[in-house]
């Protein structure tokens, strides 16, 4: 991954964390690395544990940020969330996978939250 892409991703994750806090989420962990993959943000929304995938784009020629999530990435997100729950003995908690789309193509960043993006809880 190029330096510019890493910097764009890092900026997007920082903006997303602040955005989520403003929406009432409590940020538990960022950039959580597991054997199955990385979880960008682990947060709590009320009683629900949320595993948040952040997608950031500076240009929209190839689609919106959320459209860049492949079936393979979805499978990794599910496996990573399950692994996290087991590792920290949190299987009893309700959980979901959310997406935050960060559009940096305009002067002001545009963020959008998609709760329960995979439709499973």
Curated annotation (Swiss-Prot):
It comes from the Bacteria. GO terms for molecular function: nucleic acid binding. Transmembrane segments: none annotated. InterPro entries: Restrct_endonuc-II-like, tRNA_endonuc-like_dom_sf, UPF0102_YraN-like. Belongs to the UPF0102 family. NCBIfam families: PRK12497.1-3 (NF009150), PRK14688.1 (NF011280), YraN family protein (TIGR00252). This is UPF0102 protein DET0781.
């Amino acid at each position: 991954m190029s330096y510019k892409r890493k910097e764009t991703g890092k900026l997007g994750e920082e903006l997303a964390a602040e955005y989520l806090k403003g929406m009432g989420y409590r940020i538990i962990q960022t950039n959580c690395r597991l054997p199955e993959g990385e979880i960008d943000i682990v947060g709590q929304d009320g009683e629900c544990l949320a595993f948040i995938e952040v997608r950031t784009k500076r240009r929209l020629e190839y689609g919106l940020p959320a459209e860049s999530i492949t079936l393979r990435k979805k499978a990794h997100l599910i496996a990573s969330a399950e692994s996290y729950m087991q590792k920290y003995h949190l299987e009893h908690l309700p959980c979901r996978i959310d997406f935050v789309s960060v559009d940096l193509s305009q002067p002001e960043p545009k963020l959008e939250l998609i709760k329960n993006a995979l439709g499973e809880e």
